[in-house]
């Protein structure tokens, strides 16, 4: 069942560590508190099997909770009898796996103890409105004096036939703030005491953003 789980964590930044061969490796640091099951969905009532998990508990007095959480969410947590969380995520599971889980069950980094590689999903950094050279790596025009253009896209269509620009062509537009998954990242270290996971390489998003960690889809076994 644990091989099907996806858990939420927080990107803390990047550091350098030495591996067992003495090589300096750039690592991303992911902190991960316990993910708590807040709802269980079964095929007979919901049409599919899944669990909903919460992370980053909101610890405030109940009388001020309405200032942090909207009423529908408060009612949702009260119905399940769970604590109130800032982040929620639904994970599809098999029928057998759902039957093994109960409300309030907690999952943490121990899920990945025997895993050598993981996939990490997150929302990439927003870059705002950008041109084609930054978005797609276009070469641009001549940089010399007298050039008609330097950073333009260049030709984007023909003349009378077809007499239009094909849709989907690469143009200047908004860049970033999209869901990105980086696959098959090597797990360097898991610190259960500090609740920290070190993975080789970069992961999506800025520091402090929420990322989703799962067992690599390319992992063997």
From Swiss-Prot:
Keywords: Ribonucleoprotein, Ribosomal protein, RNA-binding, rRNA-binding
GO BP: translation
A GO CC term attached to the entry: cytosolic large ribosomal subunit
Keyword hit for Chaperone: no
Record GO terms (molecular function): rRNA binding; structural constituent of ribosome
Complex formation: Part of the 50S ribosomal subunit. Forms a cluster with proteins L14 and L19.
NCBIfam families per record: L3_bact
Function: One of the primary rRNA binding proteins, it binds directly near the 3'-end of the 23S rRNA, where it nucleates assembly of the 50S subunit.
Similarity section: Belongs to the universal ribosomal protein uL3 family.
Record-given protein name: Large ribosomal subunit protein uL3
Organism: Chlamydia abortus (strain DSM 27085 / S26/3) (Chlamydophila abortus)
